[in-house]
Amino acid sequence: MSAQDFLVELGTEELPPKTLVSLADAFLAGIEKGLSGAGLTYSAKQVYAAPRRLAVLITALATQQPDRSVNLDGPPRQAAFDADGNPTQAALGFAKKCGVDLSEIDQSGPKLRYSQTILGKPTTSLLPTIVEDSLNDLPIAKRMRWGARKEEFVRPTQWLVMLFGDQVVDCTILAQSAGRHSRGHRFHHPQDVRISSPAGYLSDLRAAHVLADFNERRQIISKRVDELATQQEGTAIVPPSLLDEVAGLVEWPVPLVCSFEERFLEVPQEALITTMQDNQKYFCLLDAEGKLLPRFITVANIESKDPAQIVAGNEKVVRPRLTDAEFFFKQDKKQKLETFNDRLKNVVFQAQLGSVFDKAERVSKLAAYIAPRIGGDAQRAARAGLLSKCDLSSEMVGEFPEMQGIAGYYYAKADGEPEDVALALNEQYMPRGAGAELPTTLTGAAVAIADKLDTLVGIFGIGMLPTGSKDPYALRRAALGILRILIEKKLDLNLVETVKFAVTQFGAKIKPAGLAEQVLDFIFDRLRARYEDEGVDVAVYLSVRALQPASALDFDQRVQAVQAFRKLPQAAALAAVNKRVSNLLSKAEGSIAQTVEPKYFDNANEFSLYSAIQQADHAVQPMAAERQYSESLARLAMLREPVDAFFEAVMVNAEDANVRANRYALLSRLRGLFLGVADISLLG
């Protein structure tokens, strides 16, 4: 079957840069779906996106649908004809439905059947609907109308190119009649651009100063920004999201170096970086020590004959932004950080839980409780907790919300607070996302855990549990943050006692009955997803969860040990034995004796297992004390042979009550050894 290349380009006013890639990808996906549904084959696909256009190129697209054979089954033969062989209404109705005479219906089988061949339609007749459906299905949060037209799209449309081979596909979509003329760069080439063929699309636009390939523009910007940064003896800060956004703003990227006055460097560099990145879409430069340089890179959308004019314009625009940041910083520093707490008494944290100041006081007490239990200083943690929310009422954070915690750090430093106290004001929000940085100080870790735990206990205490996708207080993230800090920083904190202490801080504001258990279950349940992401089988998690360790670090150490144990050749058999023993013990009548009496042994294999258990117990006790769980399970794996021999030769439920009870006690000792690490019966 013959094939031709197909190109569709929709020209628009400037598209939202942050959603440009997702719109383009959805456009391609919609066209792929339409082609697949129509049975049209092709060899390759490519999507293009620029500020004023979305385009899709399909290579070697079939020029026509394949013919299709369709079989329609009708009524059973005995229902289609009466005793005299005359057609019934069922037969006549089926023929009418098929649009043919009854004589054209196949009557040889058990049912009447009509077979027909549906000729494939020309691809050109199908493309308009496929393209239109794809555009209508784009994930556009809010569509707009323009002029007096009824059509709706994310931005007003300007032109439409649709070529199949070298021929225009005749159609009108979103108020635009298809043609072969695109448009060049708004300034360098404002005239129409004739697209010679689908394959020539990129080169035709390149000649008109338009780089239609988003990835090409992104690579050019990234490479040139790095080159310019090196020339300035610095390193560019290039967040992927900012790079994507800038690539979505320009058709012909030209990065240029600009500068600002060095006096602005007295302002916290995070504030300067925030305003330059978020408001101006600039790439900031750092020196070898990570300090902000008084220079930045802007990406122009024009190759100017006088670049200095563009540089001067950007420097003029950024100056008021930096001046604002400087003003807020100086205003805030006119008073001590602690005095900002008074303003927080009138700021509601949560209606039932009090003000932000109330929260800061609770965090202070809880951090002081946590700090010495993880090796930190209670007084410094209490101080950091008390100051933790002060900067929320500062001018700086009011203008730049991203500066919360960071501003507090700088103001605390200026007030002469200890370094770890100042750092804790920023570290309280860590980790700020999945895989993000953790606190570096014990004071910061204590405040971070306290802040998150206070939120968890408080919100759970008033019954506002997260449901489905709704988690307005980010409780899942808070729980995961606590776990990451404790596990990755190797902090051995008893969460059971800590949560109970946190509950006492709220007084009558919450309902304490069963609250601590509910919060603990929520926190430890988050570990399940964490381990699944790491490739740990859920059975391993459940085997440790059954023991309900109080420490997240201890929990993790047990999980790692069980994970290693599962790789041992004896693991499966011992897991099965533990399951068997668990079932036997659960059915035992009365209480099981705590001690084993060798005098009741009547089989050599009982003596062998008892001796092996005694030796194993003696070996693993010091391991358990040091939480050497992997070593402990490896030692217990040596019990497989005496255990197997025992079950092969010994009937546990002996007729003699004393012998039977003694065997239950022996098996209880065996199971107890493994339960020192995990319930491995759940691994089977």
Swiss-Prot record:
Catalytic activity: tRNA(Gly) + glycine + ATP = glycyl-tRNA(Gly) + AMP + diphosphate
Organism for this UniProt entry: Pseudomonas savastanoi pv. phaseolicola (strain 1448A / Race 6) (Pseudomonas syringae pv. phaseolicola (strain 1448A / Race 6))
Top-level EC class as recorded in UniProt: ligase
GO MF entries: arginine-tRNA ligase activity; ATP binding; glycine-tRNA ligase activity
Keyword set, alphabetical order: Aminoacyl-tRNA synthetase, ATP-binding, Cytoplasm, Ligase, Nucleotide-binding, Protein biosynthesis
Protein localization: Cytoplasm
Identification of the protein by name: Glycine--tRNA ligase beta subunit
GO cellular component: cytosol
